[in-house]
């Protein structure tokens, strides 16, 4: 959503950074292909690509319609496949690059009411693992990061104000900048010590 990206873009630029913001439907193959080509043409080589789109919904199995299940899969898994494949096309000739997929605890375990979400997240993890094994010999680092906890974003603050207030008192809410530092660390790792999977969670999170 371009409107939602605008405040973030302004904040980055205000702090002296350089930022470009685009919006697209990550589930549409043609849009993703055009998007990747646009970045490479207008901005430069893609050295790092991060896919963190997903929809966390909770319905029991009988309430989970095929439409709901398919949409969650499209956003979490199919979009990840499209992005991963297209940036791989650009990175292979250069023999370098980092691709990071964001997961959740649902990536490694199922829970009642989360059949669609868990199924899609576990499929994304398998995609990441397959790509990591295939692309490492080509110089491309693929990683999967499990982000387990609420993140301090405008959306979370708006929907769960009391929860956020209590968590912030004990430093129990994940900060986007701190998550980003871990992603940057993965990108900067030497080839002799690459991470495939990393868990990130607040110290108070039950797991």
Name the predicted role of every residue range.
Residues 98-123, 129, 133-137, 151:
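Catalytic loop of short-chain dehydrogenase/reductase
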Residues 137-149, 162-207:
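C-terminal helical subdomain
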Residues 52-58:
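Conserved NAD(P)H cofactor-binding loop of Rossmann-fold oxidoreductase domains
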Residues 60-62, 68-70:
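Substrate-binding pocket helix/loop in short-chain dehydrogenase/reductase
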């Amino acid at each position: 959503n371009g409107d939602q990206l605008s405040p973030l873009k302004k904040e980055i630029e205000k702090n002296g950074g350089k930022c470009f913001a685009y919006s697209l439907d990550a589930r549409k193959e043609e849009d993703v292909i055009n998007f990747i080509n646009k970045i490479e043409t207008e901005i430069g080589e893609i050295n790092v690509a991060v896919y963190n789109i997903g929809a966390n919904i909770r319905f029991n199995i009988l309430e989970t319609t095929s439409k709901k299940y398919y949409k969650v899969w499209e956003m979490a898994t199919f979009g990840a496949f499209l992005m991963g494949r297209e940036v791989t096309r650009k990175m292979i000739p250069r023999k370098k690059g980092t691709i990071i997929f964001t997961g959740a605890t649902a990536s490694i375990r199922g829970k009642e009411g989360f059949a669609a979400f868990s199924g899609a997240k576990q499929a994304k993890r398998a995609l990441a693992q397959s790509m990591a094994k295939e692309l490492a010999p080509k110089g491309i680092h693929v990683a999967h990061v499990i982000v387990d906890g609420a993140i301090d974003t405008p959306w979370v603050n708006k929907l769960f104000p009391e929860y956020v207030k209590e968590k912030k008192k004990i430093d129990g809410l994940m900060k986007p900048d701190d998550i980003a530092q871990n992603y940057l660390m993965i990108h900067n790792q030497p080839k002799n010590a690459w991470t495939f999977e990393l868990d990130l969670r607040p110290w108070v999170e039950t797991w």
